[in-house]
Amino acid sequence: MRRKIFFSHKEELWNSWSHSGGIVLGVVFGTIFLVWCSKERSGWATAGVILYLVGMLFSYITSTVYHALSAHSVWKERLRKWDHAAIYWHIAGSYSPITLIALRNQGAWGWGLFVFVWLCAILGTISSFRKLRDHSNLETLTFIGMGLSVLVAFKPLVDALETQSLVWIFAEGVMYITGALFYSLNKRKYMHTVFHFFVLAGSICHIIAVWGILMEYL
């Protein structure tokens, strides 16, 4: 059964505009991070940052375009699947600078977590192109579970990072989990827009955390 469009035109404008801000953040700070890594000639840092940027920009671009499309557009439903899949990439991409830079030399923790989140992203992408039920609670729980999986490596993470970076990663988690709660209330007016702003706040927290990681390891 096709998804019923319940966002008003004004809501969709806010949904699109809010995540266009994420594109700007990704381009600006992505350029800064890549130039930084290039100057330091760090292949692992460069790889981590590239995966992070791919995931974040993929998510924000698909979301911005999806919500900007008319409710009557034949592309809206098709792009919706990519919009859902991109969230998995955003989460996995966010883990990449942490696992490939900070946790890479912490035994199996770095690579184990890296493989786990990207495997989840691949499986999540596949599931996104199957028959979707609107705002599935299982999907929301999967997003939260991926986000919280870092807790299994809490001790190595504490050992590997300075307190400031840890605080920003914790703040990021709070933003995303709070946003997920609003996402589950999507059928209430403007709740999806609120979710978008919490995601944007989480991205800002993560950018600051990545900045701290690069300062510490480069």
Where would I find each of the regions flagged by the language model?
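Multi-pass alpha-helical transmembrane bundles in non-GPCR membrane proteins
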Residues: 1-218
